[in-house]
């Protein structure tokens, strides 16, 4: 099956920064979690993540590539057998950056919600997101890096998904297209719930249509229950958490003297 398809059971999401170069109106990052941790503090968090028996780290944010030393952290993680997945909007992922991360990254998940520039702008990604992502897909695949596409389905983009599928049919990626329901938790997402949220039945209807009409695309989907049960996370301020019933359960802080209990033991 190869490393691209190796299943990792102990996964951790690290929202390493809440800073971002986009302003998505569905974003569920914790805006009160901003920090200015240095490399030493981030390395302490990383070592503790590894000590829990973590097999995969999803590097996220905010925009993880805004952290100046994030590649040093990825290098350390890879040295210790971690499967590194980067979730990014791609804006900072030029060819130089791709070459920097290539030895340490296993998968890059590019966030794109539409190939309609006006839709992307209305969601908060800007008019140029389509052009950026198309360029990054090509360059990442040419570099031998696995590429996923992450799409959050909201009222603003649900009618654009067929066009996205047409593009991905003609320009195949080497990973999967992940369609996710809008997750109404924390500041921005919670505030915009009414104007964004798509009914589950409507979501499943378009997902099933896409899977039927575009069998050549590896389409997967995630509902809210799956999203919040997926795996534990570490906030930018070091808080270790799991999410249950749309509420964050803080298990402790990863830079404090008292190490939190192993999150993989939380049911």
Regions found by a protein language model. Give the residues of each.
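Exposed loop/turn and edge beta-strand positions of beta-sandwich/beta-sheet ligand-binding modules
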Residues: 10, 55, 228
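Short acidic donor-binding/metal-coordinating loop in glycosyltransferase active sites
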Residues: 16, 61-62
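Residue-level recognition of short loop/turn positions
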Residues: 23, 61, 236-238
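Radical SAM/AdoMet-radical enzyme domain recognition
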Residues: 39-59, 67-161, 165-179
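Radical SAM enzyme [4Fe-4S]-AdoMet core and its adjacent flexible, acidic
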Residues: 118-231, 236, 241, 245-251, ...
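Cysteine/selenocysteine-centered motifs that mediate thiol-based redox chemistry or coordinate metal-sulfur cofactors
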Residues: 264-267
